Amino acid sequence: MVYTANKIIQIRKRDDRIVEFSQDKIAKAIFNAMRAVAEPDMEKAETLSDQVIERLNRKFHERSIPAVEEIQDLVEEILIENKLIKVAKAYIIYRDQHNK
C-alpha cells in the first residue's frame, strides 16, 4: 500500500521514549478494532489511516514529535467522523487496555 506522504517521523511513547513513527501500526490498530466488531476490512483501515496522516500533517509541523495519545485521539476522531461508531468503541477499549 502506498500511504499518504507523512511529515511526522517520530512519536513520543507513554514512557517518554522517542520511537520511529509507523503508519502501518495505525492501520493495523484500526483493522483490529474493525475485526473486533466483525467488520474486518484492511483496505478501509489503510484509507482511514491515510486520513489520520492528513490530519497529523495539518495539526503538527514537521519537526514536531506528537505523543502516542495525540495520535490515538485523531484515530478516534476519524472513526467517528466516518460514522464507524462500533469500530470507534472497540478502538477506545483497545486503547484503554494498552494504557494499563
Model region roles, listed by residue range:
Residues M1-K100:
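Long, C-terminal-biased catalytic regions of enzyme "large/alpha" subunits
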